[in-house]
Structure formats: C-alpha cells, structure tokens
From Swiss-Prot:
This is Ubiquitin-ribosomal protein eL40 fusion protein. There is a cross-link at residue 48 (Glycyl lysine isopeptide (Lys-Gly) (interchain with G-Cter in ubiquitin)). SMART domains: Ribosomal_L40e, UBQ. It comes from the Eukaryota. Disulfide bonds: none annotated.
Length: 128
C-alpha cells in the first residue's frame, strides 16, 4: 500500500509499505529517500508520536494515510569558543563589598547610592 509522509517544509514523500511494516522500517525508507538518519526522525499520526517496535497496523494506518515527519531537536553542547566568551563575560567583573553590586572590571567606585558609591571593591570569585 502507499502512504504519504509530509515534512515541516511542506514536501510530501510517497512510500510503498505493508501494514505489517514496523516504524523502524518506515524510518529506514525515509532515510533512503531523503537521507535523514532514523534517530533524528519523529513520525506523528493522528496527533500521536509513533513508537519504534510497533507496526503500521498497530496505529490503524491504512492506504493513502499521511504521516507527519518532525526532526528531533538536538542541543546542550556549546561551542568551546562561545563557552569561553560566556565565562569571560560572566566572571570578569568586580563586586562591591558592601552592597554586592556587579560592576565592570575597570570600575573604581560602586554605582549604587545605597552604599554611598564606596570604593571597597573586589574581583568576582570564580566557581570551582
């Protein structure tokens, strides 16, 4: 039977499958046609994400049904140069010893009125 897979870009892919095919098989066919690795694919049908290990028949997917392909979001890794820049921005500061206001490195007096613009400053402590 023929089913359709619609991507978020609006492209529709036609696939030749059997009702007994597993979701892994469908993802492999999508990889053959589009080059998207199966571990990055999420298939949605009738508002539900299709789980690997189950068949098309388990989800009552029939001929000419349309599945929606969503790519899995990857994240959590920051580029080393960007991480160094973030650390520099967050940790190269001075702190007022009276009111704990964060100040730029070149500051000589506190910017807050509450501590009387004191000059009692220290470098911000680094995390261990």
């Amino acid at each position: 039977m023929q089913i359709f897979v619609k991507t978020l870009t609006g492209k529709t892919i036609a696939l030749e499958v059997e009702a007994s095919d597993t979701i892994e098989n469908v993802k492999a066919k999508i990889q053959d046609k589009e080059g998207i690795p199966p571990d990055q694919q999420r298939l949605i049908f009738a508002g539900k994400q299709l789980e690997e290990g189950r068949t098309l028949a388990d989800y009552n997917i029939q001929k000419e049904s349309t599945l929606h392909l969503v790519l899995r979001l990857r994240g959590g890794v920051m580029e080393p140069t960007l991480e160094a820049l973030a650390k520099k921005y967050n940790w190269e500061k001075k702190v007022c010893r009276r009111c704990y206001a964060r100040l730029p490195v070149r500051a000589t007096n506190c910017r807050k009125k509450g501590c009387g613009h004191c000059s009692n400053l220290r470098m911000k402590k680094k995390l261990r």
